[in-house]
């Protein structure tokens, strides 16, 4: 897995938020600039706080048992870190999802169930921030249709009430257990 280092820095170029990872590697965040705030006007170092978010989420996902390639994991980690640092607050969309009798998260992973029964697919999300009764999530499913007029894309941000979150329990292989 790619680990943060002191040479990484955020910047904007050609209407994109980017992270220079050194060695000619550049990460481009999937978020439109209109949805971001506090953008760097020049190079902005990947901070200690960014590193803490990145590493904490990496540990959580590793413990969850979710099977991801190194590339998928790094992409999720970088997108989540960028969202926490730069994404504008988003509006609640709880009415799109069913209230759950047993709700919560498991190692920051959760599922969302659309209220529209014509769309039975669950969307898998990572909870990147929780405050009070709400959760800000990032979709990690490839896409997620919740009704005939609304479809979310991978890495799109979704904010819901905590009672909409279904804990995503993944089988943990024996070799991952302590």
Curated annotation (Swiss-Prot):
Its main location: cytoplasm. It comes from the Bacteria. Keywords: Cell cycle, Cell division, Cytoplasm, Septation. Disulfide bonds: none annotated. GO terms for biological process: division septum assembly; FtsZ-dependent cytokinesis. Interacts directly with FtsZ. This is Cell division protein ZapC. It comes from Pseudoalteromonas atlantica (strain T6c / ATCC BAA-1087). The lineage of its organism: Bacteria, Pseudomonadati, Pseudomonadota, Gammaproteobacteria, Alteromonadales. The gene is zapC.
């Amino acid at each position: 897995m790619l680990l943060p280092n002191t040479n990484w820095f955020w910047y904007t170029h050609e209407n994109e938020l980017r992270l220079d990872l050194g060695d000619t590697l550049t990460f481009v965040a999937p978020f439109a600039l209109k949805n971001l705030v506090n953008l760097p006007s020049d190079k902005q170092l990947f901070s200690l706080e960014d590193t803490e978010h990145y590493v904490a989420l990496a540990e959580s996902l590793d413990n969850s048992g979710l099977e991801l390639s190194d590339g998928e994991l790094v992409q999720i980690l970088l997108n989540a870190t960028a969202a926490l640092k730069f994404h504008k607050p988003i509006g609640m969309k709880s009415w799109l999802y069913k209230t759950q009798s047993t709700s919560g998260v498991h190692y920051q992973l959760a599922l969302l169930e659309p209220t529209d029964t014509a769309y039975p697919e669950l969307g898998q999300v990572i909870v990147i921030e929780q405050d009070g009764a709400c959760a800000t999530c990032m979709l990690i499913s490839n896409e997620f249709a919740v009704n005939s007029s609304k479809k979310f894309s991978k890495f799109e941000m979704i904010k819901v009430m905590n009672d909409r979150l279904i804990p995503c329990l993944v089988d943990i292989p024996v070799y991952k257990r302590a």
